[in-house]
C-alpha cells in the first residue's frame, strides 16, 4: 500500500498473467530442487486462497456472514499466503515438521492480524491508500460490521442491511453505516481481536532462541498491527 500495484500500472490482464507467471516459477523451482514438501505447501496455499475468495463472493451476495465465516475467509484468502511463506522457509532450512508447523501458525496469526487491521482502515481516514467505506460499497461484511449487526437493535440491523444491499453507493448512507459501527463498539472489538492474534504470533516467536531473524519477525508483527496505511 502506498505504491503502484501491477494492476494500477498495467490493468487486469497483465496483472493476472504476472501472478500466474510468478506462481508457476515458484512451483517449477520446487520441482527442480525436488522440494516436494514446499510444493505441497505452496499448492495448498493456492487452494485455500481460492476457497477464501469464493466464500467471500458467496457471502457478499447473500449478506449472511457470521464471525466464524469471516475468520474462515481471511484465514484462507489472506493468512494462508503468509503462513505458507513462513512454512516453506522453515522447512527449506530445517526439514523439521514440528518447527515448520510452528512457523506456519505464526504466519497465520500474523496474516489474520494484518487483515483485521486492513479492514479497520475502512472506518478511518481516507489517506490510507483505499477509500473509506470501500468494503461497504462492495458489500463486504468485515469484523467491525459483523459485530455491530450482531449486537445492535433489530431496527438498526434492518436499516444497515438495507443500506448495504440497496444504497451502498450513496455517500451519506455509507457514512451512516460507519457511524453506527463506531457507536456500537465495532472498531474497539476488532482492535481487541487483532491484538489477541498479534499476541499469539509474538508468543510463538518467544519459543525460538534470540536472534536477528526473530527480532525482524517481531518487528514485522508490530508493523502489521500499527501501520498507518
Residues covered by each model-derived region:
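All-alpha prenyltransferase/terpene-synthase fold signal
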Residues: 1-229
Amino acid at each position: 500500500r502506498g505504491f503502484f500495484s501491477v494492476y494500477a500500472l498495467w490493468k487486469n490482464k497483465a496483472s493476472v498473467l504476472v501472478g500466474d507467471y510468478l506462481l508457476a516459477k515458484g512451483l517449477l523451482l520446487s520441482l527442480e530442487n525436488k522440494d516436494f514438501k514446499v510444493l505441497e505447501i505452496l499448492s495448498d496455499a493456492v487452494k485455500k486462497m481460492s476457497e477464501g475468495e469464493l466464500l467471500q463472493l458467496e457471502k457478499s451476495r447473500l449478506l449472511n456472514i457470521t464471525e466464524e465465516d469471516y475468520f474462515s475467509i481471511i484465514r484462507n484468502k489472506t493468512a494462508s499466503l503468509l503462513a505458507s511463506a513462513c512454512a516453506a522457509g522453515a522447512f527449506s532450512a530445517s526439514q523439521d515438521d514440528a518447527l515448520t508447523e510452528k512457523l506456519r501458525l505464526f504466519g497465520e496469526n500474523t496474516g489474520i492480524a494484518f487483515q483485521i487491521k486492513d479492514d479497520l482502515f475502512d472506518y478511518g481516514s481516507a489517506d490510507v491508500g483505499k477509500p473509506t467505506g470501500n468494503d461497504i460499497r462492495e458489500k463486504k461484511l468485515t469484523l467491525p460490521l459483523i459485530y455491530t449487526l450482531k449486537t445492535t437493535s433489530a431496527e438498526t440491523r434492518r436499516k444497515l442491511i438495507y443500506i448495504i444491499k440497496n444504497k451502498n453507493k450513496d455517500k451519506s448512507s455509507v457514512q451512516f453505516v460507519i457511524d453506527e459501527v463506531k457507536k456500537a463498539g465495532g472498531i474497539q472489538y476488532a482492535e481487541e481481536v487483532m491484538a489477541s492474534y498479534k499476541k499469539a504470533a509474538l508468543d510463538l516467536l518467544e519459543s525460538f532462541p534470540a536472534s536477528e531473524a526473530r527480532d525482524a519477525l517481531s518487528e514485522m508483527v508490530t508493523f502489521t498491527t500499527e501501520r498507518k496505511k
